[in-house]
Amino acid sequence: MKKILKISIGILLFIGLQSANAASLESTQKIFDEARGICKTFLKQCEPHLVISNQWQAVTHKEKDIYITSDLVKSLTEDELRAVIYHEVGHAVLRHTTREANWLMSVSANKTYTKEAHYNLRRAHEYEADRFASYTLKFTRRPNHLPEALFKIVPPEYWNVEFPTHPSIIDRVHRVKTIINKGGF
């Protein structure tokens, strides 16, 4: 298992997050602090963690721990990193892990489970987390950075692909831009 570290300026210096457009050391710490604050606003406690890895990944675990890999942090601008972290905060605040577990228990009790229904639920949660991030980013006056981050994270040949757990990037970006332009949550 990869070593998991709480983010700090010293750790960031150690792994060398000094690429040309990457978020600065101070801004990365600030974004992680903002994430904690947003969670507290919704009476949730969440903690961002940095995972030293050459993969590009951000995930929420048990609705309180947000993990983001060092290479993903290195690849994003400050505003794109904020958008990705706010998306993960959305999963925590909206209790997606608990909701999915409750759904799985109810369908297993009724013996009505299908993979497609489960995948639809997971994709719906992605849309909800995107909506949460977009709404939150509107208050920072930086709403367009979630689409930019999504396009950066996923290679162009996969933009139209719908994955079992995630909608296509094109569809997600279209929905986010609709939220940005029309407002609403």
Describe each PLM feature range.
Residues 1-23:
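Classical Sec-dependent N-terminal signal peptides that target proteins to the secretory pathway
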Residues 22-185:
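A Zn2+-metalloprotease active-site environment signal
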